[in-house]
């Protein structure tokens, strides 16, 4: 078995790539040093301990067809599209050292003609006339015998889209989760006009080989060309599941309010593991009975617009005289919780 392994994904599906990453990390020989390269189509990737409703504008993501994906490592929320290059270094202990992988990434940038440096928050920065700006962010994961360093390099990303999806709606979320630190970012194309993913990948590969003094042939991965990955189907199913991407969120509370022509409504949700544990509805409506019934039925329901919308069919059957009001309430909730 060679000491180095190079894998390149030909898929742009973020859920596929994260599942491959997880399988490789769990099954790699701890004596190997692995570099895995890929790109994702429109995606917001959140850290293992983050709350997607707090970090992301989930409504706009759904409208624009942007995928939400939770990774197994820590760190903050990032937006990926095909103008981002993703890399991951994996190694067994005691050889794993994130300062080594950081040095390889910096060497790759140097090969491209970019002088960058590492910051205290695990980012790679470049000095510009507008101050220091981030061109790469990183996240890390360690087990008892191995570790990995996951990073992205911004090539020509639409930074306005990044800001749109990572800035949540102006709703108050009193969360126990971790908020991302928003950083000033820069595209490499500002420094290297015309830079492409293939050039960045080549530089990362050359820096990886140079550091370890050896070369290996790349293994190309796609949904139709998988390496030997026992258990991949189960890992992929978990990575695609709502329970992992949304339900794994830390406990949080969410408050919503709206005024209708029949009265004002204020809702308080306590949510844990993506399920509503407690719901309170306050209103000056002249007939609060349907709202009381809704509050009771919300308990134990997944914090998803479709799951909550499904409650209204029976509510309208139980309160036929209030169908118009319940339709208005259902429409508002579906829009507010997307």
From Swiss-Prot:
The reaction(s) this protein catalyses: L-lysyl-[lipoyl-carrier protein] + (R)-lipoate + ATP = N(6)-[(R)-lipoyl]-L-lysyl-[lipoyl-carrier protein] + AMP + diphosphate + H(+)
Family matches, as CDD domains: LplA (cd16443)
InterPro entries per the UniProt record, alphabetical: aa-tRNA-synth_II/BPL/LPL, BPL_LPL_catalytic, Lipoate_ligase_A, Lipoate_protein_ligase_C, LipoylTrfase_LipoateP_Ligase
Gene3D superfamilies listed in its UniProt record: Bira Bifunctional Protein, Domain 2 (3.30.930.10), CO dehydrogenase flavoprotein, C-terminal domain (3.30.390.50)
Residues where ATP binds: 71, 76-79, 134
Homology family: Belongs to the LplA family.
Record-linked NCBIfam families: lipoyltrans (TIGR00545)
Protein name stated in the entry: Lipoate-protein ligase A
Annotated source species: Aeromonas salmonicida (strain A449)
């Amino acid at each position: 078995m060679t000491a180095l392994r190079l894998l390149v994904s030909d898929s742009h599906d973020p859920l596929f790539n994260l599942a491959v990453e997880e399988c490789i990390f769990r099954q790699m020989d701890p004596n190997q040093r692995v570099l895995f390269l890929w790109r994702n189509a429109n995606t917001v990737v959140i850290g293992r301990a983050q709350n997607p409703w707090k970090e992301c504008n989930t409504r706009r993501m759904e409208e624009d067809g942007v995928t939400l994906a939770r990774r197994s490592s820590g760190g903050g929320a990032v937006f990926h599209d095909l103008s981002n290059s993703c890399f991951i270094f994996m190694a067994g202990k005691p050889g794993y050292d994130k300062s080594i992988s950081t040095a390889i990434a910096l060497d790759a940038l140097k090969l491209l003609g970019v002088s960058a440096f590492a910051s205290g928050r695990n980012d790679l920065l470049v000095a510009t006339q507008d101050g220091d700006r981030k061109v790469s962010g990183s996240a890390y994961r360690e087990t008892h015998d191995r570790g990995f360093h996951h990073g992205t390099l911004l090539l020509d990303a639409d930074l306005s889209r990044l800001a749109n999806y990572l800035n949540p709606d102006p709703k108050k979320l009193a969360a126990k989760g971790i908020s991302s630190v928003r950083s000033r970012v820069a595209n490499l194309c500002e420094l290297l006009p015309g830079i492409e993913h293939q050039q960045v990948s080549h530089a990362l590969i050359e820096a990886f080989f140079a550091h370890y003094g050896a070369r290996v042939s790349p293994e190309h991965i796609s949904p139709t060309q998988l390496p030997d990955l026992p258990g991949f189907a189960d890992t992929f199913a978990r990575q695609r599941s709502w329970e992992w991407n949304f339900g794994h969120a830390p406990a949080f509370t969410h408050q919503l309010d709206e005024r209708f022509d029949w009265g004002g409504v204020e809702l308080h949700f306590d949510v844990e593991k993506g399920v509503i544990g407690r719901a309170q509805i306050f209103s000056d409506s002249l007939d609060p009975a349907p709202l009381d019934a809704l509050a009771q039925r919300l308990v134990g329901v997944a914090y998803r617009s479709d799951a909550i919308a499904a409650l209204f069919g029976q509510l309208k059957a139980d309160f036929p005289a209030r169908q118009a009001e319940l339709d208005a309430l259902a429409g508002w909730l579906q829009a507010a919780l997307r």
